[in-house]
């Protein structure tokens, strides 16, 4: 029997990945609302920016119309299918009494996302986790946000880390990055314990 490692957050956050996607279409307001009703304490989604600068929640970041697929960034919000919610619609519909994990798919979206959250409930910033793939950009975001109480994570895969995981953990901690967002198959007890040390 594998021993369960203690959580550094009590109680641990149970993020609903793209909402309750086993019971409702993923990344829809219906899926997010249902996830919270089913007991999730956090919601997770990818965030894309539209051509007119609106943060929307979707996994693939493309819209299929007929036989054509086009990136969300080429559409204005009004031209997107209705099932794709904006970040603002999520907050207006689901409130702000949960943790929020957002994977940034547009490198320049973080500031807009923080503005939306602050405009609805600035206390949610303390429970918001922004995940950025670029190591350089996540460090830049810490400099931009300074002491703003927002959590910043680098998203990567274990195989992409140059050097050892311990060096990466130390590097992130030195730059005040709150953690790392690895794929679930990359994690094991040793890595959890290692990153908890920093």
Role assignments for model-derived ranges:
Residues 1-198:
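Phosphate-group recognition and catalysis centered on beta-loop-alpha active-site segments
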